[in-house]
């Protein structure tokens, strides 16, 4: 019985480890990344939930109008929820945007008190650090931000302000 329990425990550990590796986010350069975090008494890899659905009504309501969000579960563990259908439709045509979205949500997972501008700043810096930012990608990200006319105040009030504050932060070294 003891051997059976040990084997079962080993199987569960392998399944968890392999499950996380399989669920790693695919960056536009082909790398697979996980969102590592450490805050409070918790550290590890943020959970990723790829929300796939057939009908819009089946879409995870936590997403609201976003393509990804970070939420803390009941135990305070960060969970990144990604609209898998939107990713399937748009990832090839706008790879910089998806890399940015992932690193933005990961920034929230790493520090849940981080605001939207600071999360944008952290995402921009992480992409730069990984060699994923260049003039064309920056312009793609800028175009997406500028298309957001009205945003809540925590985002700066508009996409223009959010993007301006993101670049300002990234150039200063804050975030």
Where do the PLM segments sit?
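Catalytic Zn2+-binding segment of zinc metalloproteases
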Residues: 105-118, 125-132
């Amino acid at each position: 019985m003891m051997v059976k329990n040990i084997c079962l425990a080993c199987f569960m550990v392998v399944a968890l480890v392999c499950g996380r590796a399989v669920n790693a986010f695919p960056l536009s350069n082909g790398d697979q990344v996980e969102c590592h975090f450490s805050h409070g008494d918790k550290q590890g890899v943020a959970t990723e939930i790829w929300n796939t659905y057939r009908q819009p009504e089946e879409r995870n309501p936590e997403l609201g109008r976003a393509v990804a969000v970070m939420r803390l579960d009941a135990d305070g563990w960060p969970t990144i929820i990604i609209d898998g259908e939107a990713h399937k439709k748009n990832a090839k045509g706008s790879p910089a945007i998806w890399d940015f979205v992932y690193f933005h949500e990961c920034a929230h997972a790493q520090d849940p008190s981080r605001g939207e501008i600071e999360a944008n700043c952290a995402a921009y810096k992480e992409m730069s650090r990984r060699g994923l930012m260049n003039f064309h990608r920056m312009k793609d990200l800028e175009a997406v931000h500028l298309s957001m006319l009205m945003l809540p105040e925590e985002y700066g009030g508009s996409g223009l302000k959010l993007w301006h504050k993101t670049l300002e932060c990234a150039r200063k070294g804050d975030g």
